[in-house]
């Protein structure tokens, strides 16, 4: 599945979960993915989100995509212990 199709499917979650940004990173963002590679996402929200809700979102996204999804609650700062080499913004209210 290509990034455009992933973005189209994931945009269906925006309103339901008050998502303000969906950012793809990892192998799918830099083009080194295999067909079965996981989907690494930074997800930002307009409201506070519990770990239970994050888990529910992850499960629903995996079911919708048919791929493993890893979610990082954004925004990410320089102090966070995660390295993001390339980002592909799939959705943003800030455009």
Q: Whereabouts are the PLM-identified features?
A:
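Catalytic core of pol beta-like nucleotidyltransferases
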Residues: 1-23, 29-35, 46-95
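Amphipathic, hydrophobic secondary-structure cores in small proteins
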Residues: 39-44
